[in-house]
UniProtKB/Swiss-Prot annotation:
PANTHER family: QUEUINE TRNA-RIBOSYLTRANSFERASE. Substrate binds at residues 89-93, 143, 187, 214. GO terms for cellular component: cytosol. The lineage of its organism: Bacteria, Pseudomonadati, Pseudomonadota, Betaproteobacteria, Rhodocyclales. This is Queuine tRNA-ribosyltransferase. Pathway: tRNA modification; tRNA-queuosine biosynthesis. NCBIfam families: Q_tRNA_tgt, tgt_general. The gene is tgt. The keyword tRNA processing applies. Keywords: Glycosyltransferase, Metal-binding, Queuosine biosynthesis, Transferase, tRNA processing, Zinc. Homodimer. Within each dimer, one monomer is responsible for RNA recognition and catalysis, while the other monomer binds to the replacement base PreQ1. Gene3D superfamilies: Queuine tRNA-ribosyltransferase-like.
Length: 370
């Protein structure tokens, strides 16, 4: 893995991340393909909207279809028909999401399979082994996502467990001679000094990139902004910086302003399937009756396949009728919007006009999609 910092503007960074399956221009938004597919999108459609890298989910792919199946294809790229880079999360967040169904110990996490109830055990070592079979370009360490709310003692205990798991993840990654990139994840809840302690330990271990985890897990926006503003500038400047699970277009712009390079979130795809569409001039809900006879495109400034060919009225009809095509066209548009946003931000940083772009972005988004 190689990361080049190409330019900066008002704290924002323009870079290039070179991975085993290609180069990724940053800042970058990564669509989420939990089960080896970005919902309602073919790989060709994903490429057409400008996606450079996508996510796979270690936890879910381990459970179904299983490592033997993916391994028989030589890894996740061939299995899902995607020849560009893939990042896999470690399974830590999914285990965290199981709540009472899981039991965390020093060794790892015991839990009941959400598919068939089978008793399973996931450890840092097993997570690294799974991700090595998946052959993802970026591997994430196995950590515990600190819940919100958490007392200081709870956050400290969770972070220090993640710190020990980070060491074990690194050791197993090296033992496996995995030639891909391994990212560490900074935890520590809503406590700045715990975030600093986590980052220091991760730097001592050594990773190819650094992520901020444990945000956008239910905390108030002010707390998220505070921890992001504190933590992001402290991440190593010569390594890629990744804000996990974030977020809205505004969240992404705020993250980039704080020096973040990489983002992922289910929001554009999940919202698309629910008829919530993002545009340059605000968001709209296509199910609303106001769109029933509206012959305009979603966004006259958008060049996506959906906006070039279909009206709001047709998309409203598809959504009301429950047609699969509605989810597909909505997802094409939302992902194209996110990819266009990050492409424009890359250009603005390169031209040293990031602050001007953000001012215009906020003004346009505030007008409301009419």
């Amino acid at each position: 893995m190689q990361f080049e910092l190409l330019s900066t503007s008002a704290g924002a960074r323009r870079g290039r991340l070179t991975l085993a399956h290609g180069a990724v221009e940053t800042p970058v938004f990564m669509p989420v393909g939990t089960y080896g597919t970005v919902k309602a999108m073919t790989p060709a459609m994903l490429s057409d909207v400008g996606a450079q890298i996508c996510l796979g989910n270690t936890f879910h792919l381990w459970l179904r279809p299983g490592l033997d199946i993916v391994g028989a294809h030589g890894g996740l790229h061939r299995f899902m028909g995607w020849d560009k880079p893939i990042l896999t999360d470690s399974g830590g967040f999914q285990v965290f999401s199981l709540g009472a169904l899981r039991k965390i110990s020093e060794e790892g996490v015991k839990f009941a399979s959400p598919i068939d109830g089978a008793r399973l055990f996931l450890t840092p070592e097993i997570s690294m082994q799974i991700q090595t079979v998946l052959n993802s370009d970026v591997v994430m360490i196995f950590d515990e996502c600190t819940p919100y709310p958490a007392t200081r003692d709870e956050a400290a205990k969770s972070m220090r467990l993640s710190r020990r798991w980070a060491r074990r993840s690194r050791d197993e990654f090296d033992r496996l001679e995995n030639a891909n990139a391994l990212f560490g994840i900074v935890q520590g809840g809503m406590y700045e000094d715990l975030r600093d302690e986590s980052l220091g330990a991760l730097q001592d271990i050594g990773f190819h990139g650094f992520a901020i985890g444990g945000l956008s897990v239910g905390e108030p926006k002010d707390d998220m902004a505070r921890i992001l503003a504190h933590t992001a500038p402290r991440l190593p400047a010569d390594k890629p910086r990744y804000l996990m699970g974030v977020g809205t277009p505004e969240d992404i712009v705020d993250g980039i302003a704080n020096g973040i390079d990489m983002f992922d979130c289910v929001m554009p795809t999940r919202n698309a399937r629910n008829g919530w569409l993002f545009t340059r001039y605000g968001d709209l809900k296509i199910k609303n009756a106001v769109h029933k006879a509206d012959t305009r495109p979603l966004d006259p400034s958008c060049s996506c396949y959906t906006c070039r060919n279909f009206s709001r009225s047709y998309l409203h009809h598809l959504h009301r009728a429950g047609e699969i095509l509605g989810s597909m066209l909505n997802t094409v548009h939302n992902l194209h919007y996110y990819q266009t946003l990050t492409a424009e931000l890359r250009d603005a940083i390169a031209a040293d006009r990031f602050a001007d772009y953000v001012t215009r972005f906020r003004s346009e988004r505030a007008t409301g999609a009419h």
